[in-house]
Amino acid sequence: MSGNTIKVVPVIMAGGAGTRLWPLSREEKPKQFHDLSGEGTLLEQTIKRLLPLHPESCVIVTARSYEEASYAELGRIGIKGTVLSEPRPRNTAAAVLYAAAYLSRIYTDSIMVVLPADHHIRKPDEFADVLRLAVAEALKGNLATIGVKPLYPETGCGYIKASPGTGEAFPVDSFVEKPDLATARRYLEEGSYYWNSGIYAWKTSVILDRFARYLPRHHDAFTPLFALDNADIASSTGKAWEIKRAVFDAVESISIDYGIMEKTDGRMVVPGDFGWGDLGSWNSIDDILPADAEGNRSPSGQRAIFVGARDCSVFAEDKRIAVVGLSNVVVVQSGGDILVMEKDASQRVREVVDIVRSLDSGGRS
């Protein structure tokens, strides 16, 4: 976009450690910097699917330890961008406010398109169309969120209930927490509930106004950042870094949904069906991998061998893995660590991570 047209700036949340995908995803190299499907890293794919918006640049909010890797991703794609390093994780409200503070120094106003770096989108063209609709809502001064049309009764994500309306965007009635199975089935039947994708679009000026209204402690705590110049607000060294550490120490860990979106007016949901998946567990990775005739899966190019196996998945960083006579099992190899797990137990990987941390720090299991 050029001239006096308001700029659209993607803001990508890329700070999570993704420990539920251990041992491949670790604090030193989390999932957003891995190629899980043979199509590029998750962060790379996220940036590329935003290119139809023709952004002049983008912002990546991440941890200081991932700053270099984030700039490397931008360089490979050939798009200008700024990496904002958080001194410590404080959830999505602080990350959004940090990006808004930075953008308010660069532009008179801008449209922030906020999204996580760990999603998979099977229909990028349809996704781009939905993003354009969300940007159009943001230009009206609304806070737009993208809802995914549910395909089945999902209990692992939150939902957005839409109010009746006409057109391609609807007022938000409410945000609802992860339901039980019976409730999820009812949501699917009613047709007015959408999966909460965690993707948003709004004017920088509008979201700053909402922070002042609904999260004034966050807004006040970030005041020193608004006084920094453009270079210092993005710096991860020196006095500016110490200022940012004090700012992040002063705010609670609050999500943008809980802190603002559940309370504010002007909320619009833009529904879409674009093959969305939240890659938060090993079970969810199955959705992005090709399967053989027996339902066994492995990223293209990996040397997995399946003999008499059914519905098994293998992710091998640099070893040949053979699975014989097993079913419904995930095998993951990364470095010197191997995970062997029934698919139904994917939520227990966090327990393994806790034990590994204890062992690595000299504790006992």
What do the predicted segments below correspond to?
Residues 89-94, 152-154, 181-183, 276-277:
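A short acidic, often aromatic-flanked loop/helix-cap motif at beta-alpha or helix-coil junctions
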